[in-house]
Design a protein with these regions (language model features):
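Conserved beta-strand hairpin/beta-sheet module of binuclear metal-dependent hydrolase folds
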Residues: 1-38, 74, 134-136, 182-193, ...
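Active-site-proximal loop/helix segment associated with metal-binding centers of metalloenzymes
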Residues: 3-5, 116-192, 196-205, 211-213
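Short, surface-exposed connector motifs at secondary-structure boundaries
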Residues: 16, 69-74, 244-251
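Active-site neighborhood of phospho(di)ester-bond hydrolases with catalytic His/Asp-centered motifs
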Residues: 22-25, 43-52, 80, 191-196, ...
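Active-site metal-binding motif and surrounding structural segment of the metallo-beta-lactamase
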Residues: 27-78, 102-107
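Metal-dependent catalytic neighborhoods of phosphoester/phosphodiester hydrolases
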Residues: 58-65, 87-90, 260-268
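A gly/proline- and charged-residue-enriched helix-loop-helix capping module
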Residues: 85-94, 103-108
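Binuclear metal-ion centers of metallo-dependent hydrolases, dominated by the metallo-beta-lactamase
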Residues: 109-110, 199-293
Length: 293
């Protein structure tokens, strides 16, 4: 449940002027307005991990606000089976919108789709209802070689297009990206999961993530039995996954309402994975390519 200083679950990813939201708990709109950097009209995709109220109850009001922001482009929603039925039931108070809603219902253990230049992988986790985690990957091509472009006598007007992966043909000559680009470099990766016990798929998709956002429902060791019973994750378990997956940084989130001071447990958590942070509402970061690569 929400607390006066802690709203319910939602994450917004911004890329190239477009936004994807994952989950939309009660109070999401308020947090967005307080944060001040996110535009409602720019939300193109809303993904849901599962259909418990703390992850979806903020949707009706958000849809009305997106409509009031004069969005007319279709909005994509992604989530487990029955997504369209669940959303339709919530739209009783938001029946008329100036944009269409498209649905992608997940049914497989692992599925993927494209958004902008990113690949989005959805993977099933282990909760007491069907629940998915999401991993977003932005690939990065190899370095452009001016010397190779000149050796292959490629007209300069094609250089920019080749860097973007395009192929060109002129006077019987075909120019392809591999003629001027080195090996692919490490891209950017963000992985998000919540409401789950530890599973091999979480480690698989978190592997190499620049940022791993993971549930840390409980920190007290005496709550471990409760975590297993209700299929949630201990902070220490999340840290172990982060260490095994060799992530750049981990943000813990989705705390139990009984946990008023998550920071109390961070010394123990960091003894397992040093680059762990107890996340707070409206935290932001910018993921950047490593220019040395």
């Amino acid at each position: 449940m929400p607390l006066p200083y802690r709203s319910l679950t939602s994450l917004v990813v911004r890329y190239n002027g477009h936004e994807m939201m994952i989950d939309c708990g009660e109070g999401t709109q308020t947090s967005i307005r307080q944060q001040g950097m996110i535009g409602f009209k720019q939300i193109d995709v809303i993904c849901f991990t599962h259909f418990h109220a703390d992850h979806i109850s903020g949707l009706p009001g958000l849809l009305l606000t997106i409509g009031n922001a004069e969005r007319t482009e279709p909005l994509l929603m992604v989530g487990p089976k029955r997504l369209e039925k669940v959303v339709d039931s919530l739209r009783v108070i938001a029946p008329e919108l100036p944009f269409d809603i498209e649905f992608k219902e997940l049914s497989e253990t692992e599925e993927s789709f494209e958004w902008q230049d990113l690949r989005v992988d959805a993977f099933r986790v282990n909760h007491n209802v069907t629940c998915y985690g999401y991993s977003l990957t932005l690939p990065r091509t190899g370095k452009f070689s001016v010397d190779r472009a000149r050796e292959n006598e490629i007209p300069m007007k094609y250089w920019n297009g080749l860097q973007k992966g395009n192929t060109f043909e002129k006077n019987g000559h075909v120019y392809t990206p591999d003629m001027v680009l080195g090996p692919d470099r490490k891209g950017l990766k963000l992985t998000y999961c919540t409401d789950t016990r530890p599973t091999p798929l979480i480690e698989k998709y978190a592997a190499g993530s620049d940022l791993f956002i993971c549930e840390g429902m409980y920190g007290e060791k005496e709550k471990a039995v409760k975590a297993v019973e209700h299929k949630h994750m201990m902070m220490q378990e999340a840290a172990a996954i982060a260490a095994q997956a060799d992530v750049g940084e981990m943000w813990l989130t989705h705390y139990s309402p009984s946990m008023t001071k998550p920071a109390v447990f961070m010394d123990e958590v960091r003894s397992i994975f040093p680059r762990a942070i107890a996340a707070k509402d409206r935290m932001t970061t910018t993921l950047k390519f490593n220019d040395e690569e």
